[in-house]
Each structure stands twice: as C-alpha cells, then as structure tokens.
C-alpha cells in the first residue's frame, strides 16, 4: 500500500508541476475534436447516406447495404481508416507533448503536430494494419487506458453490448474477448510510443520488444493503471457528492439564492471535470512513456524552473485558467438557460411498450386502449419474428420469465 500511495503521490506531483500546460493541451484538443472534427465526420456520413437513399445504417441492414451499395460500404471503410489515422495523430501529438513538457525541451506546437502527422505517414504497412486492429479491437475494450471521442465513432454501441449480455449462451465468448483485449492492451501498452519514437524497428521486432518490456509486469502495470483510474474517479465522485449536498442545503435553506448557487456549483464542477479529464489522460500516457523508456524527466531542470517561476509559466497558467473559465462559463450559461426554462421545447411523448404508468401489460391491446386516451405522440412497441416468419408483439427474446419455457421467439412457431 505504501508503494501505491507513493506512486499516486509522485503522479499527482508530476501533474501538478505542469498542470496549466496539460489542461491547455487536453482541453484545446477536445475543443477541436468536438467542435470541428467530429461534426465534420458526422456530416460526411449523413450526407453519404442521404445521397445514396439510405435512411439509416445498423447491423440489421448491413448486408443490404453491402450488396446494394458497395461504394457506400467502401466509403465507410475509408472513413473508419481516416478516423484511425486521426486517433493515431492525436495520440502521437499527446505523447510528444508530454515528453516535451516533462523533459523541458523546446518545440513549437506546429512542429509537434507536423511530426505527429509524419509519424503516421512513415508507418510501415504491416505496422499500420496492426495499429488499426489495436484501435478497433483492443482499445475499445480497454478504455481505461485511453479514451477518445473519435474512437467512440468506431466502437460497438453500448446497447448492443448490453443486449449480448442478455444471452447466457454467448457469455463465454464475450468474457474471452474482454479478457484477451485486456491482456493485449497491457502487454502491448508500449506499442504506440514504439511506433512513434523507434521507427527503425521492423514490425516483428517492435512487437517482440513490446512483449519483452511488459514480461513479468502484467499485474504491476494493471494495478498501476487501475489505481490511477480509481483515484481520479474517486475524486470526481466525491466532488459531485459534495456539491450535490451543498445544493440540497441551498435549496432547503437559501431558496432565494438557490438558482445562482446552482449555476456557481455547476461552473466549479465543470472546471474540476476538465482538470480531472486532463489528469486521467496525462497520467496514463505518462506511465506508458516511462514503461517504454522514453520519458526521463530532469529533476534538476524541473527544480530550477519551479524556483524561477518564469513569466512564460505564469502566462501559461493564466491561459489555462482563462480557457477553463471560458469553457465552464459556456456550460454555466447553458445550465442557466436550461434551469430557467428558456430552452424548454415541448418534448415528444412516447409510450414505452404501449403502457402509461403501469396501466396494463406491456405490448397488449388493452394497455394500448388505455394509453391512447393520454394522446401520446408515439407508441414504442417490440416486434419479433417467429420461426414460421410470423410477427408477434413481444419484448423478451426468451420465454422463460413469462411462460417458463427456455426458448427464444425465433425458435418457436406462432402456432
């Protein structure tokens, strides 16, 4: 436990030395991604589907798109490759920035961005294929290591994963996939920095080096990554609980100032969340760089810089605080408008499975007749196909809970 506390203390201190630069780095990247890159990609996909007369794209109509619109599928594959390339540039830029900040080496943002783009272009073909597989198959299941709004666009949706867990027959394969992804994400944790800082190695030798670097250290690395994630999450949860209870006190004892204090609480929470986001990304990537042997900060230089408290450092801290305040202020304005009802639009009323406040059995005509009196805008029903290609209105895939029959709907006939 002492080692873990020392490990946490060292990481928090390392982040604290340069917190302003890290916050500027992470918040700026996220602003660019969420404001420009992701909307641009979303618009491109939507436009592609509209032009080709495709209303939506899910696993249910994937085969149809594959056979009837092969060019659309090719375009989507190219889009996925583009996203993987952008994720690589993002990570290369972050790795290079963290290394530069820790080692206090001079380099402009533009230089590092160009180097990150060059890192992608100089990847060997086989290394690039492995990198794509790493992003698509390993990182989505090991998001404790790295999260990106870009990767969220090419991962399996959460509702599909949840639906898979409802089928006990495939629990084994799911657990196996998660276990393998976790093992590979730790054993190949140095894969990305090796591709960035050690381009001379062949793909085979690079993988061997990654495997050797983490040999005998799997549990140690897993515990370190887990401890960092838990510690940061705990800080976030405690801060939310603190402000939640403060707001409850304000609502009960200071009702005239409750709205103003709610905006202030949300403002502070947004600043905390942005700092914790930067902390989680930087600490994990810093750990990876150290494990790969590409991060050797000079303690002497750090101490000199801390003593000098140069104008440049103070300017960066000011810029970081200004950016945090602007982001938090934008969120606070939105929260104010929301809490005051300025953004209220009449929401669409949707009856879930045709019922209203438990007024009948889900997906049944009697319940629908009662629900219709409330005049909802939409009614959501669950329709499934039987073995003899008939349709039944039913939610559960399996009849065991309703009828005591451990069979799925598509295994039985309507008769």
Language-model segments: what does each one mean?
Residues 297-415:
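Phosphate-group recognition and catalysis centered on beta-loop-alpha active-site segments
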Residues 1-347:
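Hydrophobic alpha-helical membrane segments
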């Amino acid at each position: 436990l002492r080692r873990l506390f020392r490990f946490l203390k060292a990481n928090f201190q390392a982040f604290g030395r340069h917190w302003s630069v890290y916050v500027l780095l992470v918040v700026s990247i996220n602003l660019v991604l969420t404001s420009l890159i992701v909307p641009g990609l979303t618009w491109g996909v939507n436009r592609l589907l509209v032009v080709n007369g495709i209303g939506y794209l899910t696993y249910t109509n994937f085969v149809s798109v594959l056979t009837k619109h092969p060019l659309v599928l090719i375009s989507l594959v190219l889009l996925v490759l583009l996203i993987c390339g952008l994720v690589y540039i993002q990570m290369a830029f972050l790795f290079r920035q963290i290394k530069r900040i820790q080692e206090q080496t001079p380099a402009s943002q533009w230089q590092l961005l160009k180097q990150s783009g060059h890192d992608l272009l100089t990847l060997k073909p086989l290394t690039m294929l492995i990198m794509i597989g790493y992003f698509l198959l390993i990182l989505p299941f090991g998001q404790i290591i790295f999260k990106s709004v870009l990767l969220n666009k090419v991962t399996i949706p959460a509702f599909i994963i949840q639906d898979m867990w409802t089928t006990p027959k495939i629990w084994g394969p799911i657990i196996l996939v998660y276990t393998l992804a976790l093992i590979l994400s730790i054993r190949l944790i140095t894969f990305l920095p090796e591709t960035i800082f050690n381009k001379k190695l062949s793909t085979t030798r690079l993988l061997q080096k990654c495997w050797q670097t983490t040999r005998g250290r799997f549990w140690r690395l897993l515990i370190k990554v887990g401890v960092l994630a838990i510690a940061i999450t705990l800080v976030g949860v405690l801060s939310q609980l603190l402000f939640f209870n403060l707001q409850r006190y304000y609502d009960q004892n200071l009702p005239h100032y409750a709205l103003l204090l709610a905006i202030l609480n949300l403002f502070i929470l947004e600043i905390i969340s942005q700092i914790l986001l930067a902390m989680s990304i930087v600490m994990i990537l810093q750990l990876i760089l150290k494990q790969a042997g590409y991060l050797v900060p000079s303690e002497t230089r750090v101490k000199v810089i801390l003593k000098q408290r140069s104008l440049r450092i103070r300017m960066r801290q000011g810029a970081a605080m200004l950016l945090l305040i602007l982001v938090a202020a934008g969120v606070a304005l939105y929260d104010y408008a929301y809490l005051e009802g300025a953004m209220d639009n009449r929401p669409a009323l949707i009856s879930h499975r045709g019922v209203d406040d438990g007024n009948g059995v889900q997906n049944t005509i009697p319940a629908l007749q009662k629900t219709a009196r409330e005049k909802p805008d939409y009614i959501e029903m669950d329709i499934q196909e039987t073995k003899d290609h008939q349709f039944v209105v039913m939610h559960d895939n399996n009849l065991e809970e309703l009828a005591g029959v451990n069979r799925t709907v598509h295994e039985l006939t309507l008769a």
